[in-house]
Amino acid sequence: MAKEKFERNKPHVNVGTIGHVDHGKTTLTAALTRVCSEVWGGAAVAFDGIDNAPEERERGITIATSHVEYDSPIRHYAHVDCPGHADYVKNMITGAAQMDGAILVCGSTDGPMPQTREHILLSRQVGVPYIVVFLNKADLLAEDCGGVDSEEYAEMMELVEMELRELLDTYEFPGDDTPIIAGSALMALNGEDENELGTTAVKKLVEALDSYIPEPERAIDQPFLMPVEDVFSISGRGTVVTGRVERGIVKVGEELEIVGIRDTTKTTCTGVEMFRKLLDEGRAGENVGVLLRGTKRDDVERGQVLSKPGSVTPHTTFQSEIYVLSKDEGGRHTPFFKGYRPQFYFRTTDVTGACELPEGVEMVMPGDNVQMTVTLIAPIAMEEGLRFAIREGGRTVGAGVVAKIIA
């Protein structure tokens, strides 16, 4: 069968399900594909097709993730669901599947549980910008309380909702403005809709995704940034730096900054080449060579970035969320302690840094995730949300994300 052509007529938004084990993330994922395919076209994916998530390797870390897609009237959604808690931790920290927004699934019969809290914290740390809540298993709660019209049901729902809004506030998400939809993913998956808890609730959830999660800014519309991979000097022409444009556009004649490792310097782009052809501009996703005026071969090095002036700044100290590879993943066999000084691999280069563990944490075991403050020996062009690998002698032992810049 011929591959279907991917239609680019709708904006593309990346989402995913998060929440405590057995609260119904995978059931809701399957229900979303079923309801959307029936109402707005596309293909439904069965629960088993999502639950048997294939393992992927991202930066040497094994992560089990399921990817499904569905359409709303105005958008195309790519949705990621993970089978186990550890997979969520790894996925969110490595940015293997970056989310423009998350669907927090919480069982209304249980209310918020430890992983509910942990996934909200992780979303904050790794920069998931928006959360929409689905209060699942509303049919079971209604059964326990004597029906959806009973006072007890209304009180219980209100209580769980209040707890969730407070929890979101704790981690600096706007609890009061967050859309919360109650329903039953299982009913929706089975095509039932008693008391509008099934299909209708899932439709309401999709409407909330459409209205509450803004369309993400495309990489090409963001300020120009290109990590420097290599530097050449071409006699009579000057210095050329090569790399893959991470975001934005660089045009011939534009002023640029060289940021990181040393003091920030200014330069001008006098040419862009790709495959030995001269271009007027280089765009996000392209591998290009940028010719720089007045910049000497020794003024630039791998690990720096070329960027739009003022758009990114160099820093050395930051708070991060880290996942430490387990022994089975080829990581360390032993824990590390405070004073640990590995290399931090940002974009194209390693920089040594010292780790400060949170209060009360004596050591970090392989397979753990932990918040820590890192101080690098050289500044790196950095923003919150930037991903990095932790290495020892060229071997990856962890992955992390910049949660907050300190200095």
Swiss-Prot record:
Annotated residues that bind Mg(2+) are located at T26
Name the segments for region: G5: 184-186
- Cellular component terms per the entry's GO annotation: cytosol
Query: Region (G1): which ranges?
Result: 19-26
Q: What class of enzyme is it?
A: hydrolase
Enumerate the residue ranges of region (G2).
60-64
Q: Which family does it belong to?
A: Belongs to the TRAFAC class translation factor GTPase superfamily. Classic translation factor GTPase family. EF-Tu/EF-1A subfamily.
Q: What name does this protein carry?
A: Elongation factor Tu
Annotated organism of origin: Saccharophagus degradans (strain 2-40 / ATCC 43961 / DSM 17024)
Q: What gene is this protein a product of?
A: tuf1
